């Protein structure tokens, strides 16, 4: 990212109204103020942020090794500085990983055939396009809304992986100060809504592959359908289940399933997940009370499936346990704290409720199970 050349020095007069200034230093392009805050941290940021932002600076509060209060002003970032090689490298790696996983797992191309003619792997391009299309649309929704609100956000980082989808998803980094609850809400909600729009396009795509029955026997993984997928499939008359349990749906549908599942996980109302940002914008500090319930609920769900329903750890039990642990850790960090805490209007609040409702339609108790054919 390229730094904006500030039009002037940081507005020291504004800072001194809430900060007893001892010393000012310039370090690595930043202006660092040492002293003693006269008000609580959040109040200081709220008081000085508008003037600093107008002058072209982000402002942060910290403390020194000598227990002095420190205010750091750094030039605001905007645009892209040079070629984003890390983003490009991860994207290309994920294209390759989803292509390989798609070819061997969902198109049933033998390894020997791929070795003999590597171009046969290109048959899995529809799967790769579906998966990456959903993920990138989701993250670009965050990115574009962040740029709209003038918040420093990174380009998406797509994470390659192995079976069963070839990716762990995608993330962006929010590096700038969050100006208000409206910006926090808009950035948080843009990703899930954009991703679900892409998921709808994927599941209704005319580029389908006829279902085929698997010839081999033994154990196979079954991806059960969330309600939203069944609703979309009903509209286009495309079956997602078959009388023969060995029949495999179109890999395009698998891309839609993945988009819905990632949306569900992202809408968990904890920490830096989209749901955490959205609920923080909607409820303010009350979001923390809801966040405490999430890990407990996920562990309870895993226990219910294992001890009452008899599902194994390698089915959805392990999945919910993992997300219970992950949500426990990320809940401690919490979502971004906006400078301006003015509540949202009714329109945004209703959009938030609608977004969580769509997320609920992506939920099912047992997303993954193992069956013996």
Regions found by a protein language model. Give the residues of each.
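Hydrophobic transmembrane alpha-helices and their immediate loop junctions
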Residues: 1-373
